[in-house]
Amino acid sequence: AIISARNLHKSYGNNPVLRNVSLDIFPGESVAIMGPSGSGKTTLLHALSGIIKLDAGSVLFNGPTGQVAVESLSERERTSLRANSFGFVFQQGLLVPELTAEENVSLAAMIAGVPRQQARSISADLLNRLGLGQMLDRRMGEMSGGQAQRVAIARSQVNGAPVTFADEPTGALDSKTAREVMALLLTMIPQQGKTLLVVTHDPNVAAACSRVVYLQDGQIVSDQRNSQGGVPAQNGFQNLGAQSQAGA
């Protein structure tokens, strides 16, 4: 497993958000994390990526330089881990609107320690692969939501991250653009042997993933392989998605 989580507990005040959660994530998987609002989906993503400190439990990351016990790292070490080993894609992209597409992606590369000229080269290559080769110098405010998410995907891959965490990456997009963005995520990440974890309410996003983990009240109640990932009309996850949306 590239990530092994055991007995994760997290509370905010008197409200338990994760309760004894354990799971293994493997290289090349695309894992959808579903569940009603308040079920602990985003908290689980934040726990696995070291964004938050757990109350109890362990997260082991088996990266290129060896095994890392994420929960034992200092804040500075966790920040370094995220910059160098993990990629992130969020619902709104969290891009700098005053910068161009190329500058947004290059900035992330330089934060990860890549020299400026090399960062620009990596950025241009990624944006070209995502169909934005003619938009390198366009500012984010001049781009559509789908184009901005493509920039966010490029930014998430500048460090060659073995694991990418995506939190509702298609939530602000229309259905056609959402399908395109999800297809790009799968092409850029699991189809390259890397790992993708996606928090989503969208059953079509879940259908495109190789595995669906469903949370309820901070616990995993279902963990299923999807033998027909990428075929939304012929999969077993619409019911899970409908439950998720009904509980939102």
Give each language-model segment a name:
Residues 34-36:
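The feature captures the beta-strand-to-loop junction immediately N-terminal to the Walker
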Residues 49:
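Helix-to-loop junction immediately C-terminal to a conserved catalytic motif
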Residues 58-80:
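ABC ATPase NBD Q-loop/coupling interface
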Residues 83, 138, 159:
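Conserved signature/switch motifs of ABC ATPase nucleotide-binding domains
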Residues 99-108:
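Short coil-to-helix segment of the ABC ATPase nucleotide-binding domain corresponding to the Q-loop/switch region
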Residues 139-143, 147-149:
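Conserved ABC ATPase signature
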